[in-house]
């Protein structure tokens, strides 16, 4: 992977690299084994670009706002409309939130159950007071839905979401 024409890291068995292609010729690179301070995530997307937004079908009454593309993909596999900002600390602009609020009868906020996720969900709720905030229960030892599905399976993931929503 290059940043400003300089090679900053290479793929290896011990350093896997995943690249998500986003709309408008944007990409997001993820290195799951990297330390947070050492380019764990790289992207040329702006804070205003929502992951999963271009895949919304607008054929359901519910939208889940989650924290990552991985969670969006997991929710979409359950036929649940989902989007995510570039990070939990990024704010979705007010106009977009109002548009989504008009389009969907029910909006659910499903961020990580850690400090950053809880804070991010509470901030988002200030702009979407009719939304429902849910978290993956901490006793599951999972911070998000994709981790839960990985640990407990697809069917249990669906059951948990049905119960929480």
What are these model-predicted stretches?
Residues 2-103, 121:
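Phosphate-handling DNA/RNA-contact segment within nucleic-acid enzymes
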Residues 60-63, 69-165:
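TOPRIM fold recognition
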